[in-house]
UniProtKB/Swiss-Prot annotation:
ATP binds at residues 43-51, 71. Keywords: ATP-binding, Cell cycle, Cell division, Cytoplasm, Disease variant, Host-virus interaction, Isopeptide bond, Kinase, Mitosis, Neurodegeneration, Neuropathy, Nucleotide-binding, Nucleus, Phosphoprotein, Serine/threonine-protein kinase, Transferase, Ubl conjugation. GO terms for biological process: Cajal body organization; cell division; chromatin remodeling; DNA damage response; Golgi disassembly; mitotic nuclear membrane disassembly; neuron projection development; positive regulation of protein localization to chromatin. CDD domains: STKc_VRK1. Widely expressed. Highly expressed in fetal liver, testis and thymus. It comes from the Eukaryota. This is Serine/threonine-protein kinase VRK1. The modification Phosphoserine is found at residues 342, 376.
Length: 396
């Protein structure tokens, strides 16, 4: 279900935002650092903007293997401006690389920010942002897998998402909309997952001062209704505990294919009250979602831990990771970095081998097409730097 920003729903229809017109293939745009980029074929279109393949400017055309995309919107629209603020503060390549080194991670699933600026075309001003390119989103794969992921896959995904959340939380932001459609795979490494869509990311702790808990009736039920936190249902600004609560709901849905309140999403008060009732009795939530004996105890322990967090409290991310690692151990597995996106049997927790037909469908879903609305990552930071060095030698 699409994200709903309660306080903005009415404003968006009356704001008369403008649609971005098509940019020509080969058009040159210059970012704020005076770096030139060349626009390639369009691969996506959002509500008010377009997404194109992009690469550093050269005499060559932008190939299908371009490492980046450019997201373009009319400069008087708001979503891209908001998203830019997050990326400029928290997603510079050097910031991400430093975090990876100090935390000894293999990678971090936060897209890198490569540049942004304004571009005039036919008397109109457009805002653009250069980003990594990605592959298929998890929602497509989840649906192709009969709306089930194996227990190992869910735990592996969640460990990487915890890495992401810890990073953005430490940089004063919360996401507020973790869900499968906002999780994209690295185009050439399907074992790497990235969290995208920071257009409504919230700076919960500007200059180190946490926002106070305050219920605002105008903001009730912000977010994607089936996953959004109880705080958001009550009109409270997003917080770290809210992101972790949302991840808990995602884990349950990925394992079972369904959340207890999904049959009545048109009644947000019912959804909120259901979440409150189950938060007070996590055991009943587990019984409802996992009627079989083979219940994932780590999910219950995770939910119990998250529900104890105060609004302004800093989570102990390592403790949460340990809980999920114990879950992997309980099924005879370990954190090997493999997502193993395969079909599961009859709604249970046991994985089976993916069929050739299903594998082909998933592979085809990774192909960049105009219908895709998010980014895909095909090459790394090193690839971009290699291209840059090569072109400098040619120019000499």
């Amino acid at each position: 279900m699409p994200r709903v920003k309660a306080a903005q729903a009415g404003r968006q229809s009356s704001a008369k935002r403008h649609l971005a017109e098509q940019f020509a293939v080969g058009e040159i745009i210059t970012d704020m650092a005076k770096k030139e980029w060349k626009v390639g074929l369009p691969i996506g279109q959002g509500g008010f903007g377009c997404i194109y393949l992009a690469d550093m400017n050269s005499s060559e055309s932008v190939g299908s293997d371009a490492p980046c995309v450019v997201k373009v919107e009319p400069s008087d629209n708001g979503p891209l401006f908001t998203e830019l603020k997050f990326y400029q503060r928290a997603a510079k390549p050097e910031q991400i690389q430093k975090w990876i080194r100090t935390r000894k991670l293999k990678y971090l699933g936060v897209p890198k920010y490569w540049g942004s600026g304004l571009h005039d075309k036919n008397g109109k001003s457009y805002r653009f942002m250069i980003m990594d390119r990605f592959g298929s989103d998890l929602q497509k794969i989840y649906e192709a897998n009969a709306k089930r992921f194996s227990r190992k896959t869910v735990l592996q995904l969640s460990l990487r998402i915890l890495d992401i959340l810890e990073y953005i939380h430490e940089h004063e932001y919360v996401h507020g909309d973790i869900k499968a459609s906002n999780l994209l795979l690295n185009y050439k490494n399907p074992d790497q997952v990235y969290l995208v869509d920071y257009g409504l990311a919230y700076r919960y702790c500007p200059e180190g001062v946490h926002k106070e808990y305050k219920e605002d009736p105008k903001r009730c039920h912000d977010g994607t209704i089936e996953f959004t936190s109880i705080d958001a249902h009550n009109g409270v600004a997003p917080s770290r505990r809210g992101d972790l609560e949302i991840l808990g709901y995602c884990m349950i849905q990925w394992l079972t294919g369904h959340l207890p309140w999904e049959d009545n999403l048109k009644d947000p008060k019912y959804v909120r009250d259901s979440k409150i009732r189950y938060r007070e009795n996590i055991a009943s939530l587990m019984d409802k979602c996992f009627p079989e004996k083979n219940k994932p105890g780590e999910i219950a322990k995770y939910m119990e831990t998250v529900k104890l967090l105060d609004y302004t409290e800093k989570p102990l991310y390592e403790n949460l990771r340990d809980i999920l690692l114990q879950g992997l151990k309980a099924i005879g597995s370990k954190d090997d970095g493999k997502l193993d996106l395969s079909v599961v049997e009859n709604g249970g927790l046991k994985a089976k081998t993916i069929t050739k037909k299903r594998k082909k469908e998933i592979e085809e879903s990774k192909e960049p097409g105009v219908e895709d609305t998010e980014w895909s990552n095909t090459q790394t930071e090193e690839a971009i730097q290699t291209r840059s060095r090569t072109r400098k030698r040619v120019q000499k």
